[in-house]
Amino acid sequence: MKKRWYDYLWIVSLTYLILGFFNILFAWLGLLCFFIPLIISIVKGTKGYCNRYCGRGQLFGILGGRFGLSRKADIPKWMKSKWFRYGFLIFFFLMFFQMLWNTGLVFAGAKDLGQVVTLLWTFKLPWHWAYHGTVFHQGVAQFAFGFYSVMLTSTVLGLVTMVLFKPRSWCVYCPMGTMTQLICKAKNREKE
């Protein structure tokens, strides 16, 4: 089967994670992974991003499938349940809004820039080598540290579930997938 350009988007996901090690401001590019799925689901009413363009899902598929890093076990029913998915979405939103709050505090001068990446919302990893100051306000860097934390945490969770279950198990409870699914359901209700 002939490969299409979007079959290589896993390279973009991997490159994004690598760039964040060298310059945290590249974390801003992750917003594309946030807005593009929403735009596609709002405009087209489909989960086209998840099914075709998600580089992270592709990366998990390659690592777990082609490289055999997955047990390929079925994901537990509770992880597929709407309660878990919606609960995880709410939890993710709370962590996202906390990140925005901290960014706002840095912009307001009420808090110093925290040059750390917080993994799994708990473990603060020093990341000072990835930021050397810029012409931008430190709040721009604070957002980058926070957003990279969210992206790295979701990647770690995806890798863990990839190893334990099927390669793309993360996709079952991915907050972006849950949001786009809700948008698609709402759009389909409008059509009726």
Task: Give the residues covered by each predicted segment.
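Non-ligating segments of multi-cofactor redox enzymes
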Residues: 1-192
